[in-house]
Structures are given as structure tokens and as C-alpha cells.
């Protein structure tokens, strides 16, 4: 972990799907319900949560609409994860 101007940055790649899972649990929304609200197959949601599928701009916009977390946050989480993972 490193610190820059009062901010803490993790050196560990955290999958955005882990954050998504934590978010839906906090809102008491199941993966099935999230998939329904986003008009996505449950398999797509599960693959995002497992880190097998990337969060695209379109998916980020849908997550913003359903969960209220801005799309740019989801995209930044995805980008950061993929950069650290490689």
C-alpha cells in the first residue's frame, strides 16, 4: 500500500466484481434481481462478479442506473484491476 497526498492506494488488484457483490449485498439485491433490472443474463452478472468478464461502458451505465454508483467509478475500478492484474 502506498500513500500520496493523504490518499491511500492499494498495490493489490481488487476485482470490481468483488465490489459489485459487496454493493448488491448491502442493498439486499440478489444477482438474479440485478440481472433482471439490468436486462442482462444472470451468467453475465456472475462472470463480472467472478472477474471473468470486464465491465464495459454500457454495463457501467446500467450499473449506475440500477445501483446509483456513477459509471466512471465502475470503469476506473475495471481499468485499475486490469492494469494491476497484467
Language model segments and positions:
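Recognition helix of helix-turn-helix/homeodomain-like DNA-binding domains
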Residues: 38-55, 59-64
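Residues within the helices of the helix-turn-helix
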Residues: 21, 32, 61
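The DNA-recognition helices of helix-turn-helix-type DNA-binding domains
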Residues: 27, 52, 77-81
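Key DNA-contact positions within bacterial/archaeal DNA-binding proteins
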Residues: 32, 43, 72
